[in-house]
Amino acid sequence: MDSFVLDAQNPNPKNLKNLLKYEEQLERQHVSLDNILGALDVRNHSLGQLLVLKAKGSDQGKNRSVFIDQCNNFFRNCNVEQVRLAPAQLSQLSKFYTEALYELKQPIRGVAVLKDALNILSDNKPTTTLTPIHTDFLQLCILSKCYHQALPLIESNITHINPEQSSIAIKDILCYFYYSGIIFTAFKKYKKAIEAFKFVITAPASALSAITVEAYKKYLIVYLIQFGSVQHFPKCTPAVVQRNIKSHCKPYTEFVQSFSNGNINDIMNKASSGAEFFQKDSNWGLVKLSIKSTYRRNIKKLTQTFMTLSINDIAEKVSLPKAKAEQFVLKMIEEGEIFATINQKDGMVTFDECFEDFSGPTILNDLDRNINNIVGLESKIKEMDEKISLSNNYLKKLASGKNTGQLSQYEDPMEDIS
């Protein structure tokens, strides 16, 4: 592999592109890869190091700990301009790196590394431009339970996806929003979690994917936690998803149906009968939260009917032991979900009106920030709409549709447009 090392050390940009022809050879040189890597400087020969590390990542017999250290050094010190010449290879290396950390049960080691690496393929705009590294970063945050590291990223608005620049694929996009939903759920930001899962479910599809199935399962349970019932599929859900997904989620759909009459015994029975499936999918905790949310919702309904109730009456009406009912009421008062006071002498609960003040500076600042976000999004949507309207692919589709009279209202104009 002397010729590869010489070409990798040649600073000519045209020569760097030629390095890609060595990929298959490197895949067959697993024994020599560390020596080849040692002959290259990470700063000056980044593309060469990238190809060597990618080849090493595919070696099932590699020393994972050494590989992780080598990747750490590469991601922190590589020449960004060089590695951007090979986005597909960089994305694959990121995945090998993430897998190695998972296999060693050390995902936390990669969180800070990939957080910095987000800039490489996003042109230093990681909060607006989605890349495959984003997905790997979120996966490591979830595996290491470092959710707070991912929150600022997923709360930003992604407005750019460039497959040519980042080699991003539909699986990366779906996984990004699926992982985002998991992280939002961990922070109890259920509405945002629902939107993230909904993105996966409603993404255009010609076949049902495993990611969509898992997103739908979580979507159903989180929707129950937030709203207490689930009516229909989200708008724009592909027909193939609507036709086939329920057969993969039978315990979930049955559990959802048990909420329709609000009978807590029915809900508990369906939860018990599907417990094995829920635990296997790591959704048992969410199922228990959805049951708790039913109790909370029933207690909240009482505040709309009664001014005063005893703890015993509340416990009876929501089918809870007295001590549990009191715990629920105290927790709901503490979290501002209801406004009430408990008289410890006679065990009476007095429900008060909402004392929230919507005129303070915090509310005004939030309102101002949200308005600015909407204005920015509107501007971005107009820009994207104009770009699509003037694209050759769209104009060809439009002309073709006019000639045949078969232009689809939704799918055809957007098909194959990058």
UniProtKB/Swiss-Prot annotation:
Organism of origin: Dictyostelium discoideum
Subunit structure, interactors included: Component of the CSN complex. The holocomplex is comprised of 8 subunits csn1-8. In the complex, it probably interacts directly with csn2 and csn5.
Family annotation (InterPro entries): COP9_N, CSN3, PCI_dom, WH-like_DNA-bd_sf, WH_DNA-bd_sf
Domain PCI residue range list: 186-356
Swiss-Prot/TrEMBL keywords: Cytoplasm, Nucleus, Signalosome
Keyword Cell membrane attributed: no
Annotated GO biological process: ubiquitin-dependent protein catabolic process
Protein name: COP9 signalosome complex subunit 3
Subcellular location: Cytoplasm; Nucleus
SMART domains in alphabetical order: PINT
Similarity comment: Belongs to the CSN3 family.
Record flagged with keyword Secreted: no
GO cellular component, one term: cytoplasm
Function summary: Component of the COP9 signalosome complex (CSN), a complex involved in various cellular and developmental processes. The CSN complex is an essential regulator of the ubiquitin (Ubl) conjugation pathway by mediating the deneddylation of the cullin subunits of E3 ligase complexes, leading to modify the Ubl ligase activity.
Classification lineage: Eukaryota, Amoebozoa, Evosea, Eumycetozoa, Dictyostelia
